[in-house]
């Protein structure tokens, strides 16, 4: 189980939003590439990046920053937010992004997902499922799709998708712990899903609980605010999970 440090980009700064509310942002750094270098030094092997400008409007304001990050870091990157066309995907593929996260487009144009898997391969396409009160949210969490997340996942799974990031919006940025039950249930329903947990991870104890409650089957867990505010030691958390995996 990997620990994925998260960086959310808004106007070329690293920020965090409270429950996806763009009016409730905290700016953590105006040099996101320096933060990623620190994460890399602490042992992270995969970094989770969200382009919040693109997630909301479909237009990125952060392409130069993403390019700079990739130039300065050797760690793998996964990127989400506003990736809604094959041309978008080709652009980020050209920058060297390892995993492309599709959210809104997967809900509104599932045929694009099929094309993406065909072009880039099953292991490089990740579906971002952002859920609140059981329903999938789109367009930077601002729109309710009216689709139950379990139905949506069943559809994606049937199309060959095996990599999923599931975000519990109600937990995001609240530092209240993750929804471990939801992840355990999803892995029971879809046993070979490479599932990443997102939302609420605020301590190494949360990571251990996720590992234990899913019998080590979780692919990874994303955490951002807890790292920035000193509540989660990234290096120590990675060490603990590595130890558990080796037992």
From Swiss-Prot:
Record: active site: 8, 130
Catalytic activity: 1-(5-phospho-beta-D-ribosyl)-5-[(5-phospho-beta-D-ribosylamino)methylideneamino]imidazole-4-carboxamide = 5-[(5-phospho-1-deoxy-D-ribulos-1-ylimino)methylamino]-1-(5-phospho-beta-D-ribosyl)imidazole-4-carboxamide
A Gene Ontology BP annotation from the UniProt entry: L-histidine biosynthetic process
Domain of life per record: Bacteria
GO MF, one annotated term: 1-(5-phosphoribosyl)-5-[(5-phosphoribosylamino)methylideneamino]imidazole-4-carboxamide isomerase activity
InterPro entries on file: Aldolase_TIM, His_biosynth, HisA_bact_arch, Isoase_HisA-like, Isoase_HisA-like_bact, RibuloseP-bd_barrel
Main location: cytoplasm
Protein's UniProt name: 1-(5-phosphoribosyl)-5-[(5-phosphoribosylamino)methylideneamino] imidazole-4-carboxamide isomerase
Organism: Leptospira biflexa serovar Patoc (strain Patoc 1 / ATCC 23582 / Paris)
Gene giving rise to this polypeptide: hisA
